[in-house]
Amino acid sequence: TDHAGIATQAIVEKNLAKEKIDKNIIGREKFIEKVWEWKIKSGDLILEQLKKLGCSCDWSRSRFTMDKLMSEVVTKVFVALYNKKLIYKDKKLVNWDTNLKTAISDLEVVQNEVQSQLYYIKYSIEDSDEQITIATTRPETMMGDAAIAVNPKDLRFKNLVGKFAIIPIVNRKIKIIEDHYADPEQGTGAVKITPAHDFNDYDVGKRNKLEIINILEKDGKINNNGIKGYIGLDRFEARKKIIIELKNLNILEKIDNIKNKVPYGDRSNSIIEPLLTEQWFVNAKSLSKAPIQTVKSKKTTFFPENWTKTFYQWMENIEPWCISRQIWWGHRIPAWYANDGKIFVAENLKQAEILAKKFYKNKDFKLIQETDVLDTWFSSALWPFATLGWPKKTNELKKFYPTSVLVTGFDIIFFWVARMLMMGNYLLKDTPFKKVYVHALVRDEKGQKMSKSKGNVIDPLELISEYGADPLRFTLISMASPGRDVKLSKDRVTGYRNFLTKVWSANNFLKLNNCK
């Protein structure tokens, strides 16, 4: 099982809060002790569910991603990839959870359709009576605007291209540029570009060498790049205030009520902000080449076969993989910082000090370890060989690597399957598995993803206690057809239990009557 970094930390923090204990007061080491206590008490629930369902496994071989040997492998791989320049630190736009105060993966972001407002705002043209109107759902980000983009084919704005617009209230001028990202059919056709707070805008900013102005603190409040009267306000309070000001200035043209998709953190249920922060990344583009070739050569195949196309689409358009998380529970990144910011990556402090002594020669230095931990998927990506004793050439590794079949859900093909293929092909020069069997997801009776926040979680142990393991197994197997998710409910299990009861009764009748 994996250590589920963010999810586990969130649960333990909530439990401590009930006892009025603040993790920041007890400190990192004490908090990690509390997490281990919770893990020992509750962490084997998944294994218990599998056992009750009747899975026939060698349970003596169970492994955990935070086990000592697994942790050593994680450190070795990080150092090896860093030394090959496949891991690096950079400042990029990431999904930022302002509640948990950490970067999160795309998998942990849920796009919820919500009722929103689209604000049409007039920007004055410098040294002119002309105006250009843009439409945005996030007017508070005006403080970080770097340009206004229009489509090169949109003749309505040809006379304005190259001129400067004045950001209302902010009173800073920005250039009107041409970029194909601007859609003439969307909004007004003119788009405000805020590279520090939107992934698409970030790409436009890079293409056009625009200034990147971050206006948010990590808790979602306006920072010192904001304007007077807004600094320190929560982003949503800033939005309310800026709308009032725009109305008073008579430059808010109109407001449309719309439905749009907004990113939420699946753990915190808070709105996710694209935020420019320093993080650690894996050069996934370089590592993706071998897995693509592995699938093309059919050394690894997908069933159903249609998932092969999805795999190619993901891998051929892969972005750098953000592997750092600003939490305490997980594999702490093996990097040490000197007083001047110089980074030394090593398997332990002693080795880092050797590197630092060599670099600084006779100068004094002090090393402080990176506080971030690794994305849980990083250690999970090493699972096929780390659990078999790698880097030692053990009998288990020779016998079970590559394995024959991996069974998994489609939702983690990219986050887990692809990354296992990356690491296996790079470190062992061979695919970790020959076949990938992609199964359906178990959802609630309405087809919704199960989550504690929705209150729609169905615990298999409760179903087994009420109906027995066989009816639940029969239900899941009967409904698990390729390409269709399982809509699970108690009524479904009741129906299959009743059917099995009839089969059992018929069997008993035959036995009692000595039927052959």
Model segments located where?
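Active-site cores of enzymes that catalyze phosphoryl transfer or operate on phosphate-rich substrates
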Residues: 165, 266-270, 371
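Extracellular/luminal Protease-associated
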Residues: 163-218
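Substrate-binding cleft of carbohydrate-active enzyme catalytic domains
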Residues: 45, 241-246, 250-253, 283, ...
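A glycine-biased structural micro-motif
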Residues: 157-162, 228-240, 248
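Short Cys/His-rich metal-coordination motifs, predominantly Zn2+-binding knuckles/fingers
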Residues: 100, 170, 268-269, 339-341
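Conserved active-site neighborhood of enzyme catalytic/cofactor-binding cores
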Residues: 14, 97-99, 108-124, 189-191, ...
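N-terminal, positively charged nucleic-acid-binding surface of large information/translation enzymes
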Residues: 1-153, 194-207, 211-226, 235, ...
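Short acidic, glycine-rich loop/turn motifs
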Residues: 123-129, 166-171, 338-340
